[in-house]
Amino acid sequence: METFGVFHKEDDEQMDLPPGFRFHPTDEELITHYLHKKVLDLGFSAKAIGEVDLNKAEPWELPYKAKIGEKEWYFFCVRDRKYPTGLRTNRATQAGYWKATGKDKEIFRGKSLVGMKKTLVFYRGRAPKGQKTNWVMHEYRLDGKLSAHNLPKTAKNEWVICRVFHKTAGGKKIPISTLIRIGSYGTGSSLPPLTDSSPYNDKTKTEPVYVPCFSNQAETRGTILNCFSNPSLSSIQPDFLQMIPLYQPQSLNISESSNPVLTQEQSVLQAMMENNRRQNFKTLSISQETGVSNTDNSSVFEFGRKRFDHQEVPSPSSGPVDLEPFWNY
């Protein structure tokens, strides 16, 4: 059995329409088939176009007063003159006013001018400090061949057809179902709270390592061992660790007095930890101001001046390196 779409009018009268029916007339059709007939015959009514007083209705109330429409709604309206002897139209409502924008568009039937279309936007409040909304109205009036002076005296009235719709910021029209959902939403948001998408969360964040100046042999031994066993350096690749000379605590013999080599050692360790935090092991900068030119220890710090991929991995069978001359420099 064939089904029909049912639309309710204001007086609860039902209209049975075939499936897929949409009321989408052109500008010329609105003028010649609807507005012109309404002006000639006040008793004329259209199944898809209702009647409303725009001065007594707010734009968000109009979808519920329309006979038909999902994204745009049509009405017959009588323009209210602001002054009895003037030509200005009263477009104010209780909550705001309609303001004309742009230039009126001419509507032709063939080569003959039959009407004009005016675009208006609704503003909340009172002019000139009204707040612009997304409610838009197209107002159609007779003109040219069908203008008022070409009509009989009994038809000299101010009937117009208004098409009202609500648009988004992108210019698209919003259907009535969406407007209802928007109106039902509260001020609260159902979206989850923003979360930190950074891969460096609290679990993986490492504490900065403080390297004190070496003042004695015991302090030096503990600091060197702590630096290489610190969790912040645990992510260093094995190949990188193999390029670092292994120090034996028994072979370390550091004098109690200050030594410029210790300053150099501190710079190397700080550079290593900085590179580890940045996960960039391509280069390791060594300050030229504190660089040591002695031939005995220049090879020890050579790995800091070259790219790591050019270094030769020392053989593990070579045993520990005796740095006694180095520390007693």
Curated annotation (Swiss-Prot):
Residues 17-167 form the NAC domain. Residues 114-173 bind DNA. Its main location: nucleus. Keywords: DNA-binding, Nucleus, Transcription, Transcription regulation. This is NAC domain-containing protein 79. InterPro entries: NAC-dom, NAC_dom_sf. It comes from the Eukaryota. Pfam families: NAM. PANTHER family: NAC DOMAIN-CONTAINING PROTEIN 79, PROTEIN CUP-SHAPED COTYLEDON 2-RELATED. It is found in: Nucleus. The gene is NAC079. One of its GO terms (cellular component) is nucleus. One of its GO terms (molecular function) is transcription cis-regulatory region binding. Expressed at low levels in leaves. The keyword Transcription applies. The NAC domain includes a DNA binding domain and a dimerization domain. Induction: Repressed post-transcriptionally by miR164.
